[in-house]
């Protein structure tokens, strides 16, 4: 009887261990925080004289993001708008 009890406990333990979910990765391909709005948006889209910028307004209005940020690339002099779905800066 004791052998059966030990066997049953070990069997249940292994079932629980095998059915435990795997670790959840912090970075998931299904959801990415920052996504490019689309191509070279130009200087008027990211004009710092207007707050909030058109980049931020359009990301919030049309893309459902929490915020938007402009990034200027020094070599090519292109301005890109990135929509942020995780935080509002």
From Swiss-Prot:
Changing residue 8 to F: In strain: cv. Cvi-1, cv. Fe-1a, cv. Goe-0, cv. Ita-0, cv. Nd-1 and cv. Wei-0. It is found in: Secreted. The keyword Lyase does not apply. Keywords: Antimicrobial, Disulfide bond, Fungicide, Plant defense, Secreted, Signal. GO terms for molecular function: sodium channel inhibitor activity. GO terms for biological process: defense response to fungus; killing of cells of another organism. Changing residue 3 to S: In strain: cv. Cvi-1, cv. Fe-1a, cv. Goe-0, cv. Ita-0, cv. Nd-1 and cv. Wei-0. GO terms for cellular component: extracellular region. SUPFAM superfamilies: Scorpion toxin-like (SSF57095). Residues 1-26 form the signal peptide. The keyword Mitochondrion does not apply. The record marks 49-50 as: Reactive bond. SMART domains: Knot1 (SM00505). Belongs to the DEFL family. Protease inhibitor I18 (RTI/MTI-2) subfamily. This is Defensin-like protein 197. The gene is ATTI6.
